[in-house]
């Protein structure tokens, strides 16, 4: 997976400080960065940074992403964490604890097709 543009645009120390501040201020929320996968045919998302309730499921978060990119109902969308497709019933806090980045953010990418084909 290519380096995310969010990581490219912001130095590690700044990202770490921001994630720590967010987690301290909102302990029941997960800081998530969502970016479109490379070569994906779905629209780009209007904002990349999300503060997600810890008890939200991956499926519920996929719904949020679909709404933000205004994806039509007949089009598929896949959300990946480190090139892996997490189960839709998984709780975001569990995904965060297992896959958070060294900077404290959870990075997710989305695509209109299952480009990686790997499931948890």
UniProtKB/Swiss-Prot annotation:
One of its GO terms (cellular component) is autophagosome membrane. Constitutively expressed. The C-terminal 3 residues are removed by ATG4 to expose Gly-117 at the C-terminus. This Gly-117 forms then a thioester bond with the 'Cys-558' of ATG7 (E1-like activating enzyme) before being transferred to the 'Cys-258' of ATG3 (the specific E2 conjugating enzyme), in order to be finally amidated with phosphatidylethanolamine. This lipid modification anchors ATG8 to autophagosomes. Ubiquitin-like modifier involved in autophagosomes formation. May mediate the delivery of the autophagosomes to the vacuole via the microtubule cytoskeleton. The record marks 117-118 as: Cleavage. Belongs to the ATG8 family. It is found in: Cytoplasmic vesicle, Autophagosome membrane; Vacuole membrane; Cytoplasm, Cytoskeleton. Residues 118-120 form a propeptide. Interacts with ATG4B. Interacts with NBR1. Its main location: membrane. The gene is ATG8D. It comes from Arabidopsis thaliana. InterPro entries: Atg8-like, Ubiquitin-like_domsf. Keywords: Autophagy, Cytoplasm, Cytoplasmic vesicle, Cytoskeleton, Lipoprotein, Membrane, Microtubule, Protein transport, Transport, Ubl conjugation pathway, Vacuole. The keyword Lipoprotein applies. A lipid is attached at residue 117 (Phosphatidylethanolamine amidated glycine). This is Autophagy-related protein 8d. It comes from the Eukaryota. GO terms for biological process: autophagy; protein transport. It is a lipid-anchor. Pfam families: ATG8 (PF02991).
């Amino acid at each position: 997976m290519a380096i995310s543009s969010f990581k490219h645009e912001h130095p590690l120390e700044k990202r770490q400080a921001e994630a720590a501040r967010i987690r301290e201020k909102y302990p029941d929320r997960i800081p998530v960065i969502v970016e479109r996968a490379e070569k994906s045919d779905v629209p780009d998302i209007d904002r990349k940074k999300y503060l997600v309730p810890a008890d939200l499921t991956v499926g519920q978060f996929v719904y949020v992403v679909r709404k933000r990119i205004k994806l039509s109902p007949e089009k598929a969308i896949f959300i990946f964490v480190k090139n892996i497709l997490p189960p839709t019933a998984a709780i975001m806090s569990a995904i965060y604890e297992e896959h958070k980045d060294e900077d404290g953010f959870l990075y997710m990418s989305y695509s209109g097709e299952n480009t990686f084909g790997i499931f948890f």
